[in-house]
Amino acid sequence: MSSSGLYQAVREEWKSLKKSEIYDLVKKRMIEWRHGPSIVRLEHPTRIDRARALGFKSKDGFIVVRSRVRRGGSNREKIMGGRRPRRMAYNKLTRKKSLKLIAEERAADKYPNMEVLNSYYVGEDGLYKYFEVILVDRSHPNIFNDPHISWISEPQNTGRVYRGLTSAGYKVRGLRTGRKGSSKSRPSIRSNGRLRR
C-alpha cells in the first residue's frame, strides 16, 4: 500500500470512528490519557494523516505533544462584593478562546524553545478534550535549512500562538471569512471597537 493510500485509509477510519474497528482501542487509550499528565510528548502522531497534512515531518526539529483541556464553559470564583445581579455571573461564562487554542498555548508554555505549527483533535470523554499539537524547534539546523518550514525561524513568528497566528487563533478572531458580515473582525475585534468610538 502506498503512503497516500495508507493516509486515506486512516482518514476514513477516523471519519466514522464509532463504527470503526479502532473505536475500542481509542476508548481504552482515553482512559489512560485521563489519568496521566495533561501534557505528554509522543514518539509518533496518533493520526498520521492529519499530522502530515498540517506540516509534520518525521525528522529532528519536530515533536508532537498531546494536550488535555477540560470541556465546557468557564467559571470563576463567586464574587463576594456587592453589585447588581447582572454583574455577579460566575458560571455559564463562555470562553473567548476555543479549547483547541487553549491546548496549543499550554503546549507552548511547556516547551518555550519551540513554536506551535498546528494542532488537531484526537478525542474526548465526559470531562476532557484531547488535542495533539505539532511543535517546531525554531533554532534547529534541520528547520532553518528546510525551505518549506524555515519561515518559522524568522523573528516575526516568535510566540505566534500567543498572538493568534495559528489556524485555531485565526478562527477564534473571526478571520477565516472575508465575506459580508465580517467587517467588525478587522483589523481585530478590539481595535475595530476603538476605531468606531
UniProtKB/Swiss-Prot annotation:
Region of interest: Disordered: 175-197
Keywords for the protein's UniProt record, in alphabetical order: Ribonucleoprotein, Ribosomal protein
Family matches, as SUPFAM superfamilies: Ribosomal proteins S24e, L23 and L15e
Matches recorded under Pfam families: Ribosomal_L15e (PF00827)
GO MF assignments: RNA binding; structural constituent of ribosome
Gene3D superfamilies referenced in this protein's UniProt entry, alphabetically: Ribosomal protein l15e (3.40.1120.10)
Presence of keyword Ion transport: no
Ranges annotated as spanning the membrane: none
Classification via InterPro entries: Rbsml_eL15_core_dom_sf, Ribosomal_eL15, Ribosomal_eL15_arc, Ribosomal_eL15_CS, Ribosomal_uL23/eL15/eS24_sf
Gene Ontology cellular component terms for the protein in this record: cytosolic large ribosomal subunit
GO BP terms, alphabetized: cytoplasmic translation
Protein family: Belongs to the eukaryotic ribosomal protein eL15 family.
Protein name: Large ribosomal subunit protein eL15
Source organism per UniProt: Thermoplasma acidophilum (strain ATCC 25905 / DSM 1728 / JCM 9062 / NBRC 15155 / AMRC-C165)
